[in-house]
Amino acid sequence: VQADVSKTTQAESLFAAALQEFGKVDVLVNNAGVMALSTLNETSDDDFNKQFDVNMKGVFNMLRLASTHLNQGGSIINLSTSVVGLKLERYGVYAATKSAVETMSAILSKELRGKDVAVNCVAPGPTETELFTEGKSQEFIDKLANMSPMERLGQPGDIANVVNFLASDEGHWVNGQVLRANGGIV
């Protein structure tokens, strides 16, 4: 099932389809995201709105649904970015959307008190995905890769392992946290 989670009705349909198919929802991973790089003064209203609609409002829509439908003992994992800590030029709007996600996650972890639902963020550093590499020069990609003490880009599997841990029973005691899976870049 695909949906534009920034649209409330589509987010509701997505959640309803999951409930119908599986009977319950134990884990929500909010991974939808868009990024338009530009300086703040050059950011168009359209780019600003699209990033906030998908990256923040989409997460909000799914969190609102999960807070009422997620099973006791469930987990919510929201994807953020280590750019929130790096404060790189041209990432201002994108980082702002993800900072909002981190704040909502921490607050929701407290609002779900007594439901035994863990809410966390995973904040990847530069990871070799289409979203990261699109529109960037190889020189810039190499520069970011070398900022990490591990001197490489993260791989999708590096991030998936952290998400899997947080979704597992072993990771359930972790709650209200931002895990910066970035090879030490921040």
Put a short name on every predicted segment.
Residues 63, 97:
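Active-site helix of classical SDR
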Residues 86, 164, 175-186:
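Short C-terminal tail/terminal secondary-structure segment
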Residues 148-159, 170:
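A conserved structural motif in NAD(P)-dependent oxidoreductases
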Residues 68, 110-114, 172:
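Alpha-helical segment proximal to the catalytic Tyr-Lys
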Residues 3-13, 45, 157-158:
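The beta1-alpha1 cofactor-binding region of Rossmann-like NAD(H)/NADP(H)-dependent oxidoreductases
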